[in-house]
Amino acid sequence: MTKVESTSGEVSEWADLNKDILELIFNKLDVMDITMGASRVCISWFLASHNKTLWNTVDLTNLQELDVSRIFNFKDKERPIFFYKHPVDHKHGLTNLLTKIISRFFLDFFEVEGSISLMNLLVEISKLSRMAPKNLFFNFNSYIQENGLKFAAEKMPNIEKLALPIWCYQNEKSLRFAFSQWKNLKTLIIAHEHSFSGRFDFKAVGESCSNLTNLKYLGRLEEYTSREIVSYLHSLKRLSLRCFLVSSIAVYRFITGLPNLTILNVSHCKNPYDYFLPIAKSIDNYVITAATQKLEKFITCPHDCMICKDRCRYSLSYLAEVWRNDEIKELEF
């Protein structure tokens, strides 16, 4: 292949690529590559980047974080704003970009540089995806500011599967607006830590998302949280509490209080009152009996589970690596 230079003549060669080849290239790229790179090569690539099939899923889970840009205060606590690497604003311009795209396509290598905030990235994505996305997955450590969540909900109202990160500080008004837009939501994955972000408004979810049947909750499950889930999410059929802290009382509450629940996953969970004790070893017999009588599947881990024995696996860094995994297939992403 000849060396690519940033001249109009050679750009036209890229513009004239066969549509099938262009489709292969775009399918090889991720959201960041398309939004901040390929869509800016030439007009034909820009038009191709609007293809709805590219935007069924907006997957931001693999964004590579740069150093925190600055610290801001939120409710007397300091919180980070993350920026992400992307393949533009490089001194070599188009030549460098095309080289990276071809390297990614043929060699599975794509180095990215520069930075962009999450809010600005959502703006750029919405210009190309329009209202096509049905799945929206944030990076585990992303911080979604209030206007960012509102913007995502307004521009992507057809979301059916959503993964919200642990740094998601929202007031009641912003959550209510967001979920009022996501009326088609079927699956919700929440990485939530009460000490970081306060209470999550499950009432706002329940009032707007009548089609929600799948929920995954990662975090220390407070008793009030389990009561709210039972009170407001009556349509749940599948619930996963994988890899965190939950009590026998809460498990029993879910089994008996959620009328449509068929599958409950408590694998790798620990007792919140004894971090050394896996829930599988501490769960009471009355809970087992209730699960056996009602549920189609009650997922626990074996008593000799190596994950449960490793306390380091319950750190946030570990959860950031595994939160996409689940024994319930509907909750994988």
Swiss-Prot record:
Residues 11-58 form the F-box domain. InterPro entries: F-box-like_dom_sf, LRR_dom_sf. SUPFAM superfamilies: F-box domain (SSF81383), RNI-like (SSF52047). This is Putative F-box protein At4g11580. It comes from Arabidopsis thaliana (Mouse-ear cress).
